[in-house]
Swiss-Prot record:
Domain of life: Eukaryota
Function field: Electrogenic Na(+)-coupled sugar symporter that actively transports myo-inositol and its stereoisomer scyllo-inositol across the plasma membrane, with a Na(+) to sugar coupling ratio of 2:1. Maintains myo-inositol concentration gradient that defines cell volume and fluid balance during osmotic stress, in particular in the fetoplacental unit and central nervous system. Forms coregulatory complexes with voltage-gated K(+) ion channels, allosterically altering ion selectivity, voltage dependence and gating kinetics of the channel.
Lineage of origin: Eukaryota, Metazoa, Chordata, Craniata, Vertebrata
Cytoplasmic side stretches: 30-38, 111-123, 184-186, 325-353, 431-443, 533-695
Listed name of the protein: Sodium/myo-inositol cotransporter
Subunit structure: Interacts with KCNQ2 (via the pore module). Interacts with KCNQ1; this interaction is direct. Forms coregulatory complexes with ion channels KCNQ2-KCNQ3 and KCNQ1-KCNE2.
Topological domains, Extracellular: 1-9, 58-86, 145-157, 206-303, 377-406, 463-510, 717-718
Underlying gene: SLC5A3
PROSITE patterns for this protein: NA_SOLUT_SYMP_1 (PS00456), NA_SOLUT_SYMP_2 (PS00457), NA_SOLUT_SYMP_3 (PS50283)
Reaction it catalyzes: myo-inositol(out) + 2 Na(+)(out) = myo-inositol(in) + 2 Na(+)(in); scyllo-inositol(out) + 2 Na(+)(out) = scyllo-inositol(in) + 2 Na(+)(in)
Glycosylation sites: N232
């Protein structure tokens, strides 16, 4: 009989959502969301503890509880390799990538590529690739995994559950900027770890300890005779009923179908560089740190936390197979369809089945609340990130004169379009992932992300890399990966009891080896084309490479002058002349030359002046501009004060409330003090300062966490 949520569980779920909403609204009330740094980078005020927790929970969502546990149930320890690999790559982010992003004065990854290479081609390529990955590996997978949880706990239809999730996300979305996200993520991380540890302890006690888990897992096969009698199956064939012989090893032989060690080291690791070092969702959180020490501390904390999923997710998935082998290890497609609604396999229900069967009333509701809340947080982040990327990096290049309200409308329409595509993709995920959703995510990503990783690594470590090389190398890698992905969709793996008649280059070449080829081919083409074309300018590599100077230089043209207006007028004009991106957005048809003719009260800057990598904080917000518009590739927008007043009067109290809720805020330049501007500049200059004692402690932590990661790889692979 299926276990369901009791009244006490539902009450705890409701209380948890109320608490999360209160935290979000508190962050909305207290935080400054009217500036670029305030909205997108939490005012660069977050500590290492909060960011470390946010990094962990933004990665470990419900799709990981479904996917990691499911792969643990199906194939043993192998899937834990991604977690230990992430532990190491997080330190690459903290010690190499983040200092460069801070020194460059960028907020987004497309912005970094534009600043490093110039032009818009690579920016558009990266934006389009990000949107594809959001739809096919994030949004649709999140919807499917969350729906599985609801289906297991309430017994609802999968697609009814998907629609419910989208509706709940729309109702509970809080637009408090990154402060609210990090605060709620911190709460979710605490409860998620406590809940998962509790489940691990309960399940371990049920089995008899870790050594007993390893022994009994190798014996966890379904009772075929009992299943045939119970389910009255017309198909009496059985397949994949026994655990794999090397299930207790992490990195396996070169021909293994799950984790071949050469493919993982040479292909999967470079591909993962994109997610951990160049994905906006991850990088944005670390950029919110007070300084570089807090940024490094956050990656250390997240690295130590990444030791946990192997034990609190993967191992419980294996225990679920031990306890419920007849369901988790279904014997053929017909049986799988009756158990979980998927002919590909039922290992994905391992974790929710364990929660519903072993966890006591009350704690069960808390676990369900954490899973769904984490899922909705992921959905909200994906919606906002995708909308931002599409409107600013794609749509605005097509329609340069688009107003801010037009961009807001287009962004929301695009989100609706993404939701429709993602829901339509759910049934394909159900059947394509072969019962292991996590490996589906990795396969799709490995066909598309290695070229991006190659471009970022070359951009950072090789000064000679230029725009032409990066573009043609990236496009070559993308085309090859897209062709391979299309073939993978066209030649889908047959059901387990059917012969595999796919072409040899599809069924015999593991996707990690394809990722290896894509990474190195992209790098080779990029190097060759870069050497055959002119080198990048000094301005493009001054602050954007690993070899850049460690200090920031503030030019006089971007420094405060005696009068606020003169400073801002000269800053925008001179910084614009030296900037790579000169296509500034001037609303209402104003030209750049007309700036000099405006009065101080008519000018409202929404831009950071990034000369020589020095990010000066945004100097105000028009009510008609969204926080998203504010950071649009370091571009300036001006609007007359009279027009802003007219819009406010027309909107009345209703629009004032909407503006506050969404974080829109008007602030005249004449009211902005020189002290505020100079303090913000000083903060940016101080972010890269690192006291010797703190640096020593951080380096000791770096050695410790990397040593632990390598030890775990060796221990679980021997």
């Amino acid at each position: 009989m299926r276990a369901v949520l009791e009244t006490a569980d539902i009450a705890i779920v409701a209380l948890y959502f109320i608490l999360v909403m209160c935290i979000g609204f508190f962050a909305m009330w207290k935080s400054n969301r009217s500036t670029v740094s305030g909205y997108f980078l939490a005012g660069r005020s977050m500590t290492w503890v909060a960011i470390g927790a946010s990094l962990f929970v933004s990665n470990i969502g419900s799709e990981h509880f479904i996917g990691l546990a499911g792969s643990g149930a199906a194939s043993g320890f192998a899937v834990g390799a991604w977690e230990f690999n992430a532990l190491l790559l997080l330190q690459l982010l903290g010690w190499v990538f983040i200092p460069i992003y801070i020194r460059s004065g960028v907020y987004t990854m497309p912005e970094y590529l534009s600043k490093r290479f110039g032009g818009h081609r690579i920016q558009v390529y990266f934006a389009a690739l990000s949107l594809i990955l959001y739809i096919f590996t994030k949004l649709s997978v999140d919807l499917y995994s969350g729906a599985l949880f609801i289906q297991e706990s309430l017994g609802w239809n999968l697609y009814v559950s998907v629609i419910l999730l989208i509706g709940m996300t729309a109702l509970l979305t809080v637009t408090g900027g990154l402060v609210a996200v990090i605060y709620t993520d911190t709460l979710q991380a605490l409860l998620m770890i406590v809940g998962a540890l509790t489940l691990m302890i309960i399940s371990m006690m049920e089995i008899g300890g870790f050594e007993e888990v390893k022994r009994r897992y190798m014996l966890a096969s379904p009772n075929v005779t009992s299943i045939l009698l119970t389910y009255n199956l017309s198909n009496t064939n059985s397949c994949n009923v026994h655990p794999k012989k090397d299930a207790l090893k992490m990195l396996r032989n070169p021909t293994d179908e799950d984790v071949p060690w050469p493919g993982f080291v040479l292909g999967q690791t470079p591909a993962s560089v994109w997610y951990w070092c160049a994905d906006q969702v991850i990088v944005q959180r670390v950029l919110a740190a007070k300084n570089i020490a807090h940024a490094k501390g956050s990656t250390l904390m997240a690295g130590f936390l990444k030791l946990l999923p192997m034990f609190i997710i993967v191992v419980p998935g294996m225990i679920s197979r031990i306890l419920f082998a007849d369901d988790i290890a279904c014997i053929n497609p017909e049986h799988c369809m009756q158990v979980c609604g998927s002919r590909a396999g039922c290992s994905n229900i391992a974790y929710p089945r364990l929660v519903m069967k072993l966890v006591p009333v009350g704690l069960r509701g808390l676990m369900m609340a954490v899973m769904i809340a984490a899922l909705m947080s992921d959905l909200d982040s994906i919606f906002n990130s995708a909308s931002t990327i599409f409107t600013l990096d794609v749509y605005k290049l097509i329609r340069r004169s688009a107003s801010s309200r037009e961009l807001m409308i287009v962004g929301r329409i695009f989100v609706a379009f993404m939701v429709v595509i993602s829901i339509a993709w759910v049934p394909i995920i159900v059947e394509m992932q072969g019962g292991q959703m996590y490996l589906y995510i990795q396969e799709v990503a490995d066909y598309l992300t290695p070229p991006v990783a190659a471009l970022f690594l070359l951009a950072i470590f090789w000064k000679r890399c230029n725009e032409q090389g990066a573009f043609y190398g990236g496009m070559a890698g993308f085309v090859l990966g897209a062709v391979r992905l299309t073939l993978a969709f066209a030649y889908r793996a047959p059901e387990c009891d059917q012969p595999d008649n796919r072409p040899g280059f599809i069924k015999d070449i593991h996707y990690m080896y394809v990722a290896t080829a894509l990474f190195w081919v992209t790098g080779l083409i990029t190097v060759i084309v870069s050497l055959l074309t002119p080198p990048p300018t000094k301005e493009q590599i001054r602050t954007t490479t690993f070899w850049s100077k460690k200090s920031l230089v503030v030019k006089e043209s971007c420094s405060p002058k005696d009068e606020p207006y003169k400073m801002q007028e000269k800053s925008i004009l001179r910084c614009s002349e030296n900037s790579e991106a000169t296509n500034h957005i001037i609303p209402n048809g104003k030209s750049e030359d007309s700036i000099k003719g405006l009065q101080p009260e008519d000018v409202n800057l929404l831009v950071t002046c990034r000369e020589e990598g020095n990010p000066v904080a945004s100097l105000g917000h028009s009510e008609a501009e969204t926080p998203v518009d504010a950071y649009s590739n370091g571009q300036a927008a001006l609007m007359g004060e009279k027009e802003r007043k007219k819009e406010t009067e027309d909107g009345g109290r209703y629009w004032k409330f909407i503006d506050w809720f969404c974080g829109f805020k008007s602030k005249s330049l004449s009211k902005r003090s020189l002290r505020d501007l100079m303090e913000e500049e000083a903060v940016c200059l101080q972010m890269l300062e690192e006291p010797p004692q703190v640096k020593l402690i951080l380096n000791i932590g770096l050695f410790a966490v990397c040593s632990l990661g390598i030890f775990m790889f060796v221990y679980f692979s021997l």
